[in-house]
């Protein structure tokens, strides 16, 4: 057996026996390093004749390539083995709270939290979630909801209109989530029990108004729905949402094109301090509008008002978030201020449930 064959066998055995990256690195340095065994052999080529150099040089370089490839392969094996061992050894308890590290200090926006809270409440009552497009046609946003041609909401100063299309039709950014009521009635047969959270758009901006804001509406359609049912649903919602045992509500006559009769709902509260307290006090706070679905709206949804009836309500998510959590300025919701989010935001694991507490 030649000297090179013996060296090759020795080095390959050492590579195979290397148990970690440190050991394989030691073999590499001993063979291919500046003073390694193969490097020393390459240095002897200078004293050989041209013919010897050509023959022996090719064999030494072949040995060098073989050893280099074996080292790379062994490194990959050791790396894979280390990863497999680590995966087998490590376990993650997913029930533990998120660790407090910079990457895990994010906050849930109050609007997202409010939507989850409302969904939990109405989901417990048997309601399902419905959604629709933000860009609506004039028909779904106005006509189908019994808005007459001259209604102020159709004016440019109140609604965001798109440029007319090739047919001359102007689409709008929806001014309420009510178009989803029509779309749901067209697609489903009663009984219908839905809530509709979503973004809405109107040309208004101050401390309590924003050009884009959030609403949630509810709709119940069947053969026997009545005002008493509506009152019970809204009272149960307010008790659960504001987390109080009792609420006192008053229903004031009002007007909305899509309901008849229509009401504005106030809830009794205490406004003497910086935070509004519900379930106590002698003050009143308006929180939502509601009413029995107008017969014309039922017809637009493809339902016979002589057979079906229902009730609907709507409220501003931003407004009730401000009331519940004491946020003074609506514009702060959209300013992307990390300090505000740190103060008013919610932890990722603060999942609202009726049993664990909505805002625990």
Swiss-Prot record:
Subcellular compartments: Cytoplasm
Keywords: Aminoacyl-tRNA synthetase, ATP-binding, Cytoplasm, Ligase, Magnesium, Metal-binding, Nucleotide-binding, Protein biosynthesis
GO function terms (MF aspect): ATP binding; magnesium ion binding; phenylalanine-tRNA ligase activity; tRNA binding
EC number annotated for this UniProt entry: 6.1.1.20
PROSITE patterns: AA_TRNA_LIGASE_II (PS50862)
Cofactor binding notes: Binds 2 magnesium ions per tetramer.
Binding site for Mg(2+): 260
Cofactor: Mg(2+)
Protein origin, superkingdom: Bacteria
InterPro entries: aa-tRNA-synth_II, aa-tRNA-synth_II/BPL/LPL, Phe-tRNA-synth_IIc_asu, Phe-tRNA_ligase_II_N, Phe_tRNA_ligase_alpha1_bac, Phenylalanyl-tRNA_Synthase, tRNA-bd_arm
GO biological process: phenylalanyl-tRNA aminoacylation
UniProt xrefs under SUPFAM superfamilies: Class II aaRS and biotin synthetases, tRNA-binding arm
Cellular component terms per the entry's GO annotation: cytoplasm
UniProt catalytic activity: tRNA(Phe) + L-phenylalanine + ATP = L-phenylalanyl-tRNA(Phe) + AMP + diphosphate + H(+)
Major site of localization recorded for this protein: cytoplasm
Sequence similarity: Belongs to the class-II aminoacyl-tRNA synthetase family. Phe-tRNA synthetase alpha subunit type 1 subfamily.
Subunit structure: Tetramer of two alpha and two beta subunits.
Name recorded for this polypeptide: Phenylalanine--tRNA ligase alpha subunit
Lineage: Bacteria, Pseudomonadati, Pseudomonadota, Alphaproteobacteria, Hyphomicrobiales
